[in-house]
Each structure stands twice: as C-alpha cells, then as structure tokens.
Amino acid sequence: MPIQVLPPQLANQIAAGEVVERPASVVKELVENSLDAGATRIDIDIERGGAKLIRIRDNGCGIKKDELALALARHATSKIASLDDLEAIISLGFRGEALASISSVSRLTLTSRTSEQQEAWQAYAEGRDMDVTVKPAAHPVGTTLEVLDLFYNTPARRKFMRTEKTEFNHIDEIIRRIALARFDVTINLSHNGKVMRQYRAVAEGGQKERRLGAICGTAFLEQALAIEWQHGDLAMRGWVADPKTMNATLAEIQYCYVNGRMMRDRLINHAIRQACEDKLGADQQPAFVLYLEIDPHQVDVNVHPAKHEVRFHQSRLVHDFIYQGVLSVLQQQAEPSLPLTEDAISPRPIPENRVAAGRNQFAEPAVARQPEAPRYSSGASAPRPTGANYPHAPVYQKQQGALYSKLLDTPAVERKENVAPSAPALDGHSQSFGRVLTIIAPDMALLERDSHIALLALPVAERWLKQVQLTPGTNAACAQPLLIPVRLKVSAEEVAVLNRAKAVLVEMGIEFVVEAHHVTIRAVPLPLRQQNLQNLIPELIGYLAQQTSFDAANTAQWMARHLASDHNLWSMAQAITVLAEVERLYPQLVKAPPGGLLQPVDLHSAMKALKDE
C-alpha cells in the first residue's frame, strides 16, 4: 500500500480514539471549554447515558461567526499561540482537538453568539472532508453544543459502551469533580428529562461547605480537616479526612486539582498516602479534596491526550511539600490544646539568613508580613478562599477560640524586668566567616573577614556541613522518606553487615528493610537526598564490613568524604546558604578553621609590589 495522506475525517477519528473514550469524555471536554469561555452557568442534558444526546449550554463569551468553522477544525484553538503559551498553560483546554474529534464520531451541532453580534450562528460538519456549514440561528449570548448519536459511524467503539446507567454514572462523577473545582459556577445535570444534580454557585463564605457536603457526603464533611499550606510559588488548600475515622465509603473520595485542573496523579496520591500511613490500616486509603497551585512554568500538562496527568519539573519538591502539608495538619490535630502558663513568653528564635553584604536582615526586629500573592493568575480560575472558609478546622478555629476565651479570664502577667530578648539571636552570630565578596570559579569564595581578605574552599565547607548534618545529635537531620524507595541486591554477608549496623544507620536517619537477597532504602537524611544511592549504599556496606565496631561519628565522616558535591559551579546565593548553615550548626569550625578550608590572602604584599613599580 503506498504512503498517502489520510482523509480529514479518518484522521479525526483516530484522534478521537485518544480523546473520546466514552460519553463522559465528551462531557468533560465540552464543559471545560465552557469554563474557559468564562461561563457562570452550565446546563447539561443527557439522554440514554449520552449515547443518544449530550447537550451543553453555557452563558460564556461565545464564538464569533467567522471563527465557527475554525472551531470545528483540527488543531485550531484560542488558548495558545506560541511555545511560550504552551510552557505556561493556565486554561483547561489547549490542544484544539476535542471538537474536531467529537464531530468525527457523532452528529455535532455548534450554536453560538457573542455580545457584539445581533444574531446567533450555527455550524456543523459533515461529509468525508468534514466541510463546515454555517447558518443563522436563535440563541442568547453563549454557546450550545449538541452531540447526537455518539459513535454512530464507528460500530466497534459503540459496541464497547456499557449500560445506560453505567455511562451516566461516569458522567455524574465527572460533573462532581468539576463542581468541586469551580464553586463559583452553577452546574445543572439532567438525564432523560429529569434533573439529577443542581450545584448552585456559592460565594467565598461558608456556603462552600454545602456544596462539599452535597458532593462528598456529610460523613466526609464532619471528619474533614482544613489544609492551608504555602511555600514560595507552591500553595495547597483543601480538606483531608481524619485517618482515625476512615471507612470504605470515605476512601472513595480522592479528588486532587493542579491549578484548577482535575488530576489523577500518582505522585500526589503517594505523598498523601505516606503522610497518613501511620494512622491508616494496611488496606485503607486516605480521603481528600486538595487543590495545588503551582507556577505554570513548573508543570507540564501536555503529557496525556485527555489531560488526566501532569509532569512536575521538580517532582521531589512537590512531593515533599504535599507530604509536609498534610502531615502537619494531622499532627496538629493529634496534639492536645496548648497549655496556658503565667510565664513570660520566651522570644522566638529568628532563623539565620545571611545576605551578600554580610548583614543578617532577619535578625532585626521582625514585622508581620502578609503572604505573597501568586505570580500567575487565570481569569477562569476561582479566587482562593481563606482558611476561615473551610469546614471543621479544629486546629485553626476550635483551639484558637478556646484559647482566646481563656485569655479573657487570665490575670495580667507582670512584665519581667532585665529580660534581653535579643540575646539569643545575637549569640547565634558571634562566629562568622565574614562577608562574601565574590565567587572565584568554580568553587572558591573570596571573603572579607576582620578587615582581611581570605579564600574559602566551598567544597570543604560543604563536606563539613554534611558531616555535622549526618552526625546524630540535636542538629542532625531526621530521616526523610524517599519518593521512590531504592531496592538493591545484596549478598548474605552484606545482609549480616546491615543487620549489625542497623542501629547506627537508623540513628543517622537511614531507614531500610532487609530481605533475603535485597535491601530496600525507604528514608535517608537530607545530605543523601540528591545522591546516587545505587552507588553510595554498596560503598557504605563495604566500609562497614571493614569495621570491627560501628560509630556514628566515624561513619558520618566517611560518608561526608564520599558524597558528591551538590554544586558543580557555585553561585553567591549557594555559598551564602552553605556558610550560614555551617555557622549555625558548627560554630567551632568558624573559630578554628581546619586545614584546607580557609587561606588568608596577603594584599599588602601585592599592593607594595604595585607601588614599587
């Protein structure tokens, strides 16, 4: 058979195989188009589970007459126009395939009117070449899409459709997910002429609880713990059910959204499951409704044809962010109410954060700051609610209310004299390497220290920092779960070594499970997170096999010397961060620098030589 260009209808039908899986897929694509058009009301009519009719009507901005034919063409969209747009998608649709694909496997009619037009226009495609016909019609501002006889021309696909009830249940589930994503939109769903669901638009107040309860049930509503978590450009809000009260019904409630897009993401599910695993049974699943907001440049949604999956550029960061957010809420829920004493409130330690000029701006009197607003926005996305809008938030509402009422009856505490709250903060800065002037590539920092100039070897400072982080003690890094556990094959002798050294390794933050011929690394301390564990762990086992006794300090020293550097080419910010951590965790190193770390530079000799010339 010779190579030939496929007819447009056949090409669209092939694309429809990826985009249009069943009637629920059609509903999802069309409703997302309505949301992108700024609709505040969407009416969905279904007949015979979507096999006979799917009608979506909205009050969005509409489509101009001269763009109707393009709307039904393949790879035609108003959502993106360049690669820059593709790399920072904020709309739900962007491929330009949905309408063309749906039109190729059904009898689709598109009727639309914009606010600038006096009349509406209707378009439909037919024939082998999918020629579009446009004619006048009566219609208010907005768009209506009718999909008749789905898969009428692809009998094989139609044969795989399930019963009317099953197909409608899939549609109902899609609408539930969309209704949870957009509280500000009214959505009505009818089946065979009977109204099945009515989700009224709600404001930013407590009415959101009503929609949440209508979709997820009162059982979830009563057990829901509110989450409000933010770090830089990452923000997470929503609800997670108390794991102590989990049952089979609640376990079916697992809804997550990324920038308003409903998602089934294994990374997100794994992070939540890991945060709840101590309180869940082996066969139980967590229940949650979570909204993750991230810089669109940091997430790729152009992964799955139906846009069910995304790819995060910093997946480990996102995983740990979600894990810590969920875990913190669960831990605070388990904590008893804070006891009130008459002791004076101790000053809160101020974290170290050195700047390039050598001044610690965070050691100065702190001023309350408002959270930064996201640096990206979408006109179609719902405004972010505050924590007060979430139902049943015992951590943020019940405890604070109880404490506040107690404070009203608490006698005034006399202010103690001769209290120097700034002393603890100043003590942390008594030892300093000085001011970082510049970086001499690839790994030297030029410092101004006590009116003298010195060179500092950044890899050596980094090695000492990792050593102190690996050494058990008050400053030791705790075990951090791995996103994907590392499984290595080991011999019987190596298994024996690991079992003998297990206490020391666990103390250092390395958690593992030993099997017959394998070891699975489940958690490691912070310095090991970016390392190649496939190579490091066998070397560590070899080192331990040569030891007659196991000492955490010696093991930490060996590991620090064998870890790869996190930086090939150092920057000012990286150097300042590492030096600040060394000053905080190991001030003795600043007071008495070891050999190979710091080298004074004699500028006087150089200046004298220049003057002599």
Curated annotation (Swiss-Prot):
Gene Ontology CC terms, in alphabetical order: mismatch repair complex
Keyword Hydrolase: no
Region (Disordered): 364-393
Keyword field: DNA damage, DNA repair
GO function terms (MF aspect): ATP binding; ATP hydrolysis activity; ATP-dependent DNA damage sensor activity; mismatched DNA binding
GO biological process terms on file: mismatch repair
UniProt keyword DNA damage, yes or no: yes
Coiled-coil segments: none
Pfam family membership, one: DNA_mis_repair
Annotated CDD domains: HATPase_MutL-MLH-PMS-like, MutL_Trans_MutL
Gene3D superfamilies xref list: 3.30.230.10, Histidine kinase-like ATPase, C-terminal domain, MutL, C-terminal domain, dimerisation subdomain, MutL, C-terminal domain, regulatory subdomain
Alphabetical list of PROSITE patterns matching this protein: DNA_MISMATCH_REPAIR_1
Sequence similarity: Belongs to the DNA mismatch repair MutL/HexB family.
Function noted in UniProt: This protein is involved in the repair of mismatches in DNA. It is required for dam-dependent methyl-directed DNA mismatch repair. May act as a 'molecular matchmaker', a protein that promotes the formation of a stable complex between two or more DNA-binding proteins in an ATP-dependent manner without itself being part of a final effector complex.
Protein name: DNA mismatch repair protein MutL
Species name: Enterobacter sp. (strain 638)
